[in-house]
Amino acid sequence: MKLHCCLFTLVASIIVPAAFVLEDVDFDQMVSLEANRSSYNASFPSSFELSASSHSDDDVIIAKEGTSVSIECLLTASHYEDVHWHNSKGQQLDGRSRGGKWLVSDNFLNITNVAFDDRGLYTCFVTSPIRASYSVTLRVIFTSGDMSVYYMIVCLIAFTITLILNVTRLCMMSSHLRKTEKAINEFFRTEGAEKLQKAFEIAKRIPIITSAKTLELAKVTQFKTMEFARYIEELARSVPLPPLILNCRAFVEEMFEAVRVDDPDDLGERIKERPALNAQGGIYVINPEMGRSNSPGGDSDDGSLNEQGQEIAVQVSVHLQSETKSIDTESQGSSHFSPPDDIGSAESNCNYKDGAYENCQL
């Protein structure tokens, strides 16, 4: 049962009996007031409690069951014998019908001991000086029997059932919120792979937020709900693998760029494509006007300042790193070879290459 339906039933069960009680009080006050006003008519018995002046503008008279009522015909008649009364069933009312229940006196219709069946429309007809009619509606409040008690019992039963349902719903909601809060606290204390599983379990337990939630509960759970949503968002972002794979790929590319691992086949092709340098292209001329250094050795030779500059031919060759390593290996191998003593004098005038002396000048 929805909350607004329960509240509507509760309000109806309280307001309707109160309305009937207030209506009964107002009716009793009206009866006592109109009984005093009707004392001027001496022809009416003292048992009449209502007069014709009690009808309202819409010509409706309300009477309790078991009381007496008097209805006045507001039409002008030359003789009172010309006034005739009829009920809603079309029966003409006079003193002889029903053992004197309806009494017609002048232009008044007196009904004694009103019953619930007497309700309806009462019409008076006037034949002189002109033909006219006037109607009054009589409403009777049913008081005999156990209807009021039955109605009160039904209202109390409905109110009790509604109250029990509301209390049960509030208790279930409170228990559910306590369990959810406990699960959220356990989620914050959980680390590792179990955190995602806890998140899914808590997401299943969170109820749909409706207007039935009170403001106090919303304030209490607002902070933890926001924190939980933030953790869920972080977990959702960490689940997809493509960003992680892209980061690993970028890391591997950076590592290869730092190491510079070259393919040997590509290295040989680049060596073949490199143009050879000739002797003339590898000679660089030092500017004769270049000044001497400021070293102490240079300053000590004062006579060399007046000497003219000389041209020095220098041949430069560019070698790759692999070629340099091979040259270093060959130089280390040649250092282990010791030349014979008999040609020690010629060592200064010979070029040693590949284990033999070339261009020796003796």
From Swiss-Prot:
Keyword Acetylation part of the UniProt annotation: no
Cysteines engaged in disulfide bonds, as pairs: C73-C124
Entry keywords, A to Z: Cell membrane, Disulfide bond, Glycoprotein, Immunoglobulin domain, Membrane, Signal, Transmembrane, Transmembrane helix
Cytoplasmic side: 171-362
Protein location: Cell membrane
Chain segments annotated as transmembrane: 148-170
Main location: membrane
Region (Disordered): 285-306, 323-350
Signal peptide (from-to): 1-18
Glycosylation sites noted in the Swiss-Prot or TrEMBL record: N36, N41, N110
Function: Component of the elastin-associated microfibrils.
Protein name in UniProt: Microfibril-associated glycoprotein 3
Organism expressing this protein natively: Homo sapiens
Chain's gene name: MFAP3
